Structure formats: C-alpha cells, structure tokens
Amino acid sequence: MNAPHVLIDLLGACWEVDAAVVEVAWDTWGQCAGFALGDGTLALANGLWKGGPRLKPREDGGVEFVQAQAPPAPLAYVRVHEGTCLALAADPEGGLLSGGDDGRLVHLRLDGASELVAHEVDAWIDRVAASPSGGRSYACGRRVHWLGPKPACLMISGSATSMAFDPGGTRLAISHNGGVTLWAADTLRERELVWPGYHRNVAWSPDGRYLVTGMEENALHGWRVADAADIEMAGYPGQPRSLSFSADGSFLATSGGMRAVCWRFDPPRADDTPHESGIAGKTPVSRVACHPVHPLVAVGYHGGEVMLCQPGSSDILLVKGAGNGAVSAMAWSPDVRRLALGTGAGNLAIVFLPDELFRFGRRKQTGFPDGG
C-alpha cells in the first residue's frame, strides 16, 4: 500500500456536533446520510457534494486527487425526540425511521417534515428495522410490532436486543436472551432458535441461509436456518458487538478483538479458525461494515481510527486517524461510493471512496486498493 495521506483529509466532508452519534443510515436513494444523536436530534448530511473532491485518471495510469472547489453543505438538524435517539433505519418509502426513549417512532422526510408513526406510553422504542420490500417493525422491551396493512404485535421471551429483516424482507429476526425469534411476514407465525446466553445483535447472510448473533459471553452463535443446525464461534477477548457479512456471503466480519475478525461462510466448517484482518490498533475494534460489492471491510476502533482492509490481510488504507471518540456508527451508501461514519464525541463524516480508488485482480479477493 502506498497512501501518503489519510483519506478523510482528501476525500471527506466532516462536521462536529455537541452530542454522541448513536447510529447512521442512508436514505433509500442515497441522497442523504442521517445521524441519530444522543440529544434526540437527527443530523442530516447532504450526500451530494457539488464541487467536492474527486479522482482524476492519469495518462500514465492510476489516479490523482483533485481538491474540493467548494465546501460541503452544512448539516440540517431536526429535533425528533424529547430524550435520546435510540434506533434508526432507512424507510423503504423514503426518508428515515427513528425510535427514541420518549416512546415515539418518527418518520422523517428529507425535507425536514416529520410524522409520528407510533407512540408507546412509558416505554422506549429502542429497536427499529425496515426492509427494501416494504417491511417496517419496531420493538419496545418484549413487545415487537409489525407495521403495515395488517399490523400485529408479538410478545417474545426477553427484551429485544436487535432486529433484522432477511434479504427478501419476508422474515424478521429478533435477538434476545436465550436465542432468536423468527417472525414470518405472510403468516405472522414465530419460530424459536434457542441457544443459552445473551444475544446482543443479529445478522443474516446475504442468501438468507444463515443467521448469526454476537453474544455477551464473548462469542458468536450461528444457525443454518433450514434445519436450525448450530454453528459455534468462540474465543473472542471482548464482545463482538458489530457484525457484517460480505456482499457475496463468503465471510462474516466482526468486532470483538484488536483487529477485525473474519470467519469463512462458504459454507462454515466445524474446524475453521477465523482470520484477523487489518492491523491492531491501540484500542479494540468497535464497528465493522463490509463493502456492498468488493471484498473490503471498513473497520472502526474505540480510539477513533477507521481503516479499510481485506479478509486475512494486514494491508490497510487509513480512512481516519485516531481521536474524536470511539467510532460508534458506519454505513455504506446505496451507490457503494461513500462511507458515512460517526463517533461518540460527535464527529461526523462522509468519505468519498469510489471504485477508482481500488485495484483488484481477476481472481476473487485478490489485489488491494491502490492509494494512488
């Protein structure tokens, strides 16, 4: 790797706010990145930077950086909760869905107009999930609500810790103490996947065949959904609180260590050992986000660094240096050319990372990004 500068300094738009970033999500069309803040505000960052930095092809090959000709647009702020934003998701019909500790589920349009979707008295709405096919759901404690033409409510065995729709949007996975509950959209019937322990987050493989949770017991647990066969993945020094599958489903990247930990999933095998990726920072990994197309992982650290790496490789591209709090949220844009990130100290950024920045060989997962 030959990267003379930190990429955020060359290709990034940065802002600072007076509250921690809880979550970040892009709207369905990638026009805007919404940052849910700890003070109940949504900060909207325009993802279309007119006169922003760009890459210019060189006559002799490679690319060169062209500096921005205009500053990025300022953030737009919308107060959506009386307390804290707790959950955020892109709404399939446009805009964003936000849940908060005031018991409100709010739909926010990109023009700043908001609509109250649901209100739970004396309860927190701390989990929100949506699918491109139109599914919308939220949870408050043990109650999970399915929104739509035929709304329904499901009482699960423990408080919901995470929710995710499968790739087809037909099943909702809800993690909790003791395992995962699957809720089918067509029949509204539930199915239990049981494993002892506290399951804090959940992720589907892109083909919907596997489901994985990160556990408080410093381990992962997975299931082959068809027959509920168990997949055990242990040995973490810390809790794997962030999970992300590669676009082709060949590997799962997680936090929980000093480097990103990647497990093979093509398919998973009982004797497989994970591959650590990137380099060890001075602090543990806090967030991971796989690139939507390429075999790359964006890795955020508690110390504030953000790097790009490939599974099993120690080569990295440095996106952001240390400082400004732990990386608390990351999300790739729908057009896969921008990475939005936020920290616990209120540092927000959108970094332009187009395909021209990377160089891959013909074989799968070969070659590494060329810093120019």
Residue ranges of model-derived segments:
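WD40-repeat beta-propeller superdomains and closely related acidic/aromatic-rich repeat-like regions
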Residues: 1-372
